[in-house]
């Protein structure tokens, strides 16, 4: 009987942790999508989390009951004040962790993003001490703002909408979704990279990199890349 109770208690605790993690994943994904694209669609949430639209709808309904999110219209979701506050707390810890991993431990921007998912669960006092050690940065390694830190807001445009035949410098990779970060890293595209837009199609943006190589970037990825063009 005692063993049964212990196992049952452990199961409840594990389920509680898993549920909390799932809530955080959804809130931060919605936050990143709103930050990057201005809106969070069910289809985008589904793609970024690797779950079905039906699963997203089911979880969103539960988050709505907890007053973390609200449906703006069919297939659109936005964070409430409570949801945004919780998401910003997690995003702040995550982005501080990313800078620490890059600046102090020497990881690249993709590795830092992946390992920061573990560090973001450390106590606030640890994260804030790391924040001081790395010089209180205002941005993460991907150019995204760290919540709670004032910074100069520069006018940027996305690679998906910038005029062709312009030379642009990558200033920000919004959203920080691992599949996009990994893809861009494999191409050698990161913050500070120079890109020349040569042509734009319905589904692709054609660009030339500093090394002279030509690349077809899918529009859905180009919309996450914020640039300053000359």
Language model features by range: what are they?
Residues 2-50:
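Extreme N-terminal segment that seeds HTH/winged-HTH DNA-binding domains in transcriptional regulators
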Residues 54, 110:
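Key DNA-contact positions within bacterial/archaeal DNA-binding proteins
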Residues 60-61:
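Short, hydrophobic-biased segments on the C-terminal half of alpha helices
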Residues 64-72:
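A short, conserved structural fragment
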Residues 75-94:
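Basic, amphipathic "hinge/linker" alpha-helix immediately C-terminal to the N-terminal HTH DNA-binding motif
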Residues 121-226:
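Mid-protein regulatory/catalytic core that forms ligand/cofactor-binding pockets
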């Amino acid at each position: 009987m005692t063993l049964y109770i212990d196992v049952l208690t452990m199961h409840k605790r594990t389920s509680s942790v898993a549920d909390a993690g799932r809530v955080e994943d959804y809130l931060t994904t919605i936050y990143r999508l709103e930050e990057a694209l201005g809106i969070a669609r069910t289809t985008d949430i589904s793609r970024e989390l690797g779950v079905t639209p039906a699963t997203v709808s089911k979880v969103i309904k539960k988050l709505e009951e907890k007053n973390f999110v609200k449906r703006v219209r069919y297939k659109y979701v936005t964070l409430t004040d409570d949801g945004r506050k919780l998401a910003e707390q997690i995003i702040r810890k995550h982005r501080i962790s990313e800078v620490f991993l890059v600046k102090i431990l020497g990881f690249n921007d993709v590795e830092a993003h992946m390992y920061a998912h573990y560090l973001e669960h450390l106590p606030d006092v640890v994260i804030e001490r790391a924040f001081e050690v790395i010089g209180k940065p205002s941005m993460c390694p991907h150019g995204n703002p760290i919540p709670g830190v004032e910074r100069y807001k520069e006018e940027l445009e996305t690679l998906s909408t910038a005029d062709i035949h312009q030379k642009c410098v990558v200033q920000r990779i919004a959203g920080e979704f691992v599949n996009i970060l990994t893809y861009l890293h494999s191409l050698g595209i990161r913050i500070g990279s120079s890109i020349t837009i040569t042509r734009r199609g319905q589904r692709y943006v054609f660009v030339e990199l500093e090394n002279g190589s030509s690349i077809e970037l899918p529009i859905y990825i180009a919309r996450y890349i914020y640039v300053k063009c000359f």
